[in-house]
Amino acid sequence: MDGQRSEGRIAEVIASMSADIVGLQELDLGRARSAHADQAALIATQLGWKYHFHPAMRSGDEQYGNAIVSRFPIELKRAAEMPGAAPWYCREQRGAIWMQAKTDLGPVHIINTHFGLGRTERRLQAKLLIGPTWLGSVPRDEPSILLGDFNSVRTSRPYRLIGAHLRDARALVRPSGAFRTFPTRFPSLAVDHIFVNAALSPTQLSVHRTPLARLASDHFPLVCELTLKRTGCLAAGMA
């Protein structure tokens, strides 16, 4: 990452991934540091895709949060801030966004999130997303994806909480794989994950490590090809 905030580069990376649905974190809307741009809208427009942005944080006219961009029509199911309990020096409001994509193979639920840095808040955030107001309300036979930057490695409690309800695509495709995505300068941590329910079967998983991806973000995209058990293929990713 070179310190520049370029929506065009992010869109170019997404286009090179051949993905159908992408979750994005740490996007700005109206913030001075990104020239007051609506980053989600600019990325989606360059791709010719649909999108929905949810601000986890607001300060005056400035907003900061997560988005889902999709080749397919998408419908907002839920978007909300999540509980936080981090120490003051790393406190930041976190959020999650839940869309239903109307794919060629049928409807698919996608939740994109960005967990906090504190141990307690990550545990609370994991419990929220697997609970009755989020994924717990989705029938088991409806394809569901939970993806994002969880700031949690595979040995952590938040990861294990989610793993008790959903399956990590990595564990199904290549259990021994490291899939380190952060930081792009020297990838040493696997904190980005794609979880799926039993209605989906991951067939491929990779870290999209390219020179442009290294410049576009401090995380490399994690890309997963999924098969809907009753129909066919879908590609999901994070950038």
Residue positions per predicted region:
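Active-site environment of divalent metal-dependent phosphoester hydrolases
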Residues: 1, 29-35, 59-62, 118-121, ...
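N-terminal, active-site-proximal structural segment of metallo-dependent hydrolase catalytic domains
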Residues: 1-46, 51-53, 57-63, 106, ...
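Active-site metal-binding loops of divalent metal-dependent hydrolases
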Residues: 27, 115, 149-150, 220
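Beta-strand-turn-beta hairpins that frame and shape the catalytic cleft
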Residues: 62-64, 71-75, 91-112, 226-231
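Active-site beta-loop-alpha substructure in enzyme catalytic cores
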Residues: 105-137, 141-145
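Active-site neighborhood of phospho(di)ester-bond hydrolases with catalytic His/Asp-centered motifs
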Residues: 23-25, 52-55, 145-149, 168-170
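Catalytic-core segment of enzymes that process non-peptidic bonds
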Residues: 49-85
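Metal-dependent phosphoester-hydrolase catalytic domains
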Residues: 85, 100-103, 133-145, 151-239
